[in-house]
């Protein structure tokens, strides 16, 4: 269950409000899940006409105002809209946009990147730090950097450098390939290039030599061995580098990435190792090159108190380094600025109990006080906020191909001569009511198991087993209809909603497009992008195209807990049913894999214009020919193999000439097409 923070707070706004706490209108904190009971998803019964479903109901159900503000909302037509510039105006109907893109031969699944959202996120982050600096009279500046590892796509990095230029926004590289990207693209005067990750001689020399190009690379020492490497390279090249040290804080993070700190963290120097590095640099006459202190307490920090504790410890280390003679100028607070994926504004791992302004305020205030106490000049502040910048700009659109439902028809009464177990199930079904539903659920389950046992012994015929199972599902549906009207139900019936859920088969690979859903149970907001003026009467889970039982999504955002099913509309064959996965712009694309050889999806970059929008870039998804080449197949050789087999089959009269030509043509065309299904 979610462990709620002690504070509720408002969503971020362009004004970057100083308000920290926002209590619900009733004055009460949100209640967590009862240890013994859980509230099920409410639904109107088919005969319930007491109220009409409204747009506001969909807004509340999918929590779009919680996680989507100020970019996503629902319009009067029941479609999701996107406001790429936030509350500064201009919006697009996402459903209409998808249809327009499909008419341009951009098939689903489709990744839509909104360049204006990326720009708005950079503006907001810089505005928050500017406001904090002004509020606390901080005599320093903020210089953000974007960690390239969050999303290495060329068009995104190019946009980020362009949008960040007014703020001297820089880049952070965590590997040699990322360093190559950053060196080639970052041309903003005064911006910083933070060089993290494991380093060899080539990495260090390349970073140092880039100083000659007018760039400001800061080589962050993360392993003790790197100190000697940097000293040797500096002496050989005759270049005095700008150095930093990454400290392993004792402050413990929280959530999935909480182990990024501490003595056994993967990266960084312990306090004794930092002293060792300082002594070595002093002996090499390079102590004045040590100008930056860096720490990272993990990605997606959900609780503001963790940030408060970390900056308190880090600021003390910073002033001590300055007192040891280092030429300290920069403090890099790393990443961790969270994204509210579930809209609950709590310290749950998929949320955060603070906003961007709270984050900036606490960093600036603590650092100013510590430096003033020790009479040390304040540093230039740096953050590596990748997730908070990149997540919102990307929306993954996919369609539903079909559904699989448990039988919901009214069951037939038993016929004379049928197995007694069928009569027992029928009597159970007839007798279920609000008083006995729990007891009769046990009975129905027992009778179903008995029917399977009789079938395995050869006593029950196949048709009888089918009838028994239909009666069992009818009992479950009747019980579910009852408990949906209750506030809470017993633990043993909690899974009934999921047991009765439909399976919605989606045109998507979870492993390719949302690997964190599979790998670490990450929650992303998922919802239909149209029909939101209709009540979603179905409950479902999502199953992808891969031949893998893990290729599914059965965990969804909720205010009080994680839902095991998602409210969906009845699927209408022949009619499109589009769904969107939101806030997935960080890490997912680069971490996606080729399971079952489903490749990269189509991607399009959209920018708002006074008259609507323009398509800046189209990045076509992988074709079948491309994905097979990744595993060392040559498509021309494959076509030739099929051609030769067709010729042999013709010779042996196992295929007609027309059939062979049709097969060959289809085979060649398929290799040139998208790896996903035509919708």
Curated annotation (Swiss-Prot):
Residues 1-43 are annotated as: Disordered. Its EC number is 4.1.1.19. The keyword rRNA processing does not apply. The modification N6-(pyridoxal phosphate)lysine is found at residue 149. This is Biosynthetic arginine decarboxylase. PANTHER family: ARGININE DECARBOXYLASE (PTHR43295), BIOSYNTHETIC ARGININE DECARBOXYLASE (PTHR43295:SF9). CDD domains: PLPDE_III_ADC. Substrate binds at residues 331-341. It comes from the Bacteria. It comes from Nostoc sp. (strain PCC 7120 / SAG 25.82 / UTEX 2576). The gene is speA. It catalyses: L-arginine + H(+) = agmatine + CO2. The keyword Cell membrane does not apply. Its cofactor is Mg(2+); pyridoxal 5'-phosphate. Catalyzes the biosynthesis of agmatine from arginine.
């Amino acid at each position: 269950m979610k462990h709620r923070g002690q504070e509720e707070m408002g969503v971020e706004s362009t004004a970057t409000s100083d308000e920290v706490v926002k209590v619900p209108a009733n004055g009460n904190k949100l209640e967590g899940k009862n240890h013994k009971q859980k509230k099920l998803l409410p639904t109107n019964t088919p005969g319930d006409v007491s109220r009409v479903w409204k747009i506001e109901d969909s807004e509340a159900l999918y929590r779009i105002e919680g996680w989507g503000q100020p970019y996503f909302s629902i319009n009067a037509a029941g479609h999701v809209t996107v406001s790429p510039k936030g509350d500064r105006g201009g919006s697009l109907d996402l459903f209409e946009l998808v249809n327009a893109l499909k008419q341009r031969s951009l098939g689903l699944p489709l990744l839509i990147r909104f360049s204006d959202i990326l720009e708005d996120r950079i503006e907001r982050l810089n505005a928050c730090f500017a406001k904090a600096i002004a509020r606390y009279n901080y005599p320093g500046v903020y210089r953000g950097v974007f960690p390239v590892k969050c999303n290495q796509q060329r068009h995104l990095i190019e946009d980020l450098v362009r949008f960040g230029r007014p703020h001297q926004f820089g880049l952070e590289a965590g590997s040699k390939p990322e360093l190559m990207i950053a060196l080639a693209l970052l041309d903003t005067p005064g911006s910083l290039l933070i060089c993290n990750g494991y380093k060899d001689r080539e990495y260090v020399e390349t970073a140092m030599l880039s100083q000659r190009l007018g760039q400001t690379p800061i080589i962050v020492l993360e392993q003790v061995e790197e100190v000697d490497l940097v000293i040797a390279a500096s002496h050989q090249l005759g270049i005095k580098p700008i150095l930093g040290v990454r400290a392993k804080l004792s402050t413990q993070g929280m959530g999935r990435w909480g182990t990024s700190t501490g003595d056994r963290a993967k990266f960084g120097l312990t306090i004794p190792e930092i002293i060792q590095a300082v002594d070595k640099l002093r002996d090499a006459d390079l102590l004045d090159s040590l100008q930056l202190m860096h720490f990272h307490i993990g990605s997606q920090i959900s609780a503001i108190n963790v940030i408060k504790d970390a900056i308190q410890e880090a600021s003390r280390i910073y002033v001590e380094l300055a007192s040891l003679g280092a030429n300290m100028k920069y403090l890099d607070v790393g990443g961790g600025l969270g994204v509210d994926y579930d809209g609950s504004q709590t310290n749950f791992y998929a949320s955060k109990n603070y906003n961007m302004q709270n984050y900036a305020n606490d960093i600036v205030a603590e650092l100013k006080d510590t430096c003033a106490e020790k009479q040390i000049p304040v540093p230039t502040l740096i953050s590596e906020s990748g997730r908070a910048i990149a997540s919102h700009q990307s929306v993954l659109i996919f369609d539903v191909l079909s559904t699989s439902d448990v039988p919901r028809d009214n069951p037939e009464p038993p016929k004379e001569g049928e197995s007694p177990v069928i009569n027992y199930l029928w009597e159970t079904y007839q007798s279920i009511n609000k008083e006995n539903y729990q007891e009769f659920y046990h009975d129905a389950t027992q009778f179903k198991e008995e029917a399977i046992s009789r079938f395995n012994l050869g006593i029950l015929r196949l048709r009888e087993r089918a009838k028994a199972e239909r009666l069992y599902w009818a009992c479950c549906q009747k019980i579910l209809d009852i408990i949906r009207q209750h506030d809470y139900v017993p633990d043993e019936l909690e899974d009934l909603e999921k047991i009765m859920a439909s399976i919605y088969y989606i045109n998507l690979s979870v492993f390719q497009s949302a690997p964190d859903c599979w790998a670490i149970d990450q929650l992303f907001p998922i919802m239909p992008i149209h029909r939101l003026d209709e009540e979603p009467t179905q409950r479902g889970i999502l199953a992808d195209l891969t031949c893998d039982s893990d290729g599914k999504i059965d965990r969804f955002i909720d205010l009080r807990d994680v839902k095991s099913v998602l409210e969906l509309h009845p699927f209408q064959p022949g009619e499109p049913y589009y769904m969107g996965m939101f806030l997935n712009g960080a890490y997912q694309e680069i971490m996606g894999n080729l399971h079952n050889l489903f490749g990269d999806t189509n991607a399009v970059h959209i920018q708002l214009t006074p008259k609507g929008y323009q398509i800046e870039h189209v990045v076509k998804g992988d074709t079948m020919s491309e994905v097979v080449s990744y595993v060392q197949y040559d498509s021309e050789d494959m076509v030739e193999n099929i051609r030769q087999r067709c010729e042999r089959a013709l010779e042996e009269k196992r295929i007609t000439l027309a059939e062979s030509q049709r097969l060959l043509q289809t085979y060649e065309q398929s290799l040139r097409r998208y790896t996903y299904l035509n919708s």
